[in-house]
Amino acid sequence: MKKQITFLIAFAFVFSLACQTLVPPPKREGTIIADCADILRAVNGVQPVDIPESLIESGVKQGGEFDPNDYFKALTHLSMRDGYALDYVYPIDFLGSFPMLYPRPVDQPPYVSAADVPEGVKLGNFRDQLAIEDVEQGYFEYAVMDIMASQFYLVWHANYNDLLIVCDKDAANEIVDDTNSHDFGMKFDLAQQAQVRALTNVEPVVKLTDDSAIVEIVTFTKWGGFFRRTYTISRSFPHEVDVKGENLVEYDCGIMF
């Protein structure tokens, strides 16, 4: 019986590949972001690896911690609007600490801890003060910033924030191969592997209309699988942003922190 199931899955995979060859996916509208992998490497390159012990213990910044404005060295088509800097506080949460990013007026001293934020004061959403260069790359970089900006200094449960941007089919296949070669949770079964191998239109693409930018990217999380994430961003400030997700391949590592 097991051999029959394996044969059927293998047949389904081969049949799927044949269908892709005979009936190729429809041509996509927009501009493919060919340097996706280079951009992600640049962002990963500025993100810190280790969390300062003093920050974990107290939640108080003492100087020398990560400066999130360094993101704009990697994402060169983004910046904060005039009069604002990107900043964060680090509330201590023993179930999982993570940075809370906010747009800080440049004439306002930074808060060194979450306890310094006056009661009733809302820090605001940093995305609301992002300046986006009105080109395809700018809107792609917005999506990168939206996903990756808070993925540093993560502790315990905060590591559920593991969303990855998948730049092409090779990257998708590498995720499967890497997952199945390690002993971290569940592996991709044969059916899931076949679904990933059959994915099409993985590369990020940006389409500009008269008033909007539409960004399509594929993402992966160990707690959900592969998704197609579509951003619709108005091209004029203030930018209205709508995000929709479509699950392409379901997967769950089964790990619970």
Task: Give residue ranges: language-model regions.
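N-terminal secretory signal peptides that target proteins for export/translocation
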Residues: 1-2
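Sec-dependent N-terminal signal peptides
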Residues: 5-14
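C-terminal motif of bacterial Sec signal peptides marking the signal peptidase cleavage site
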Residues: 16-18
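Bacterial signal peptide processing site
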Residues: 20-22
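Extended, low-hydrophobicity segments enriched in charged/polar residues
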Residues: 26-199
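Acidic, glycine-rich flexible loop segments
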Residues: 179-227
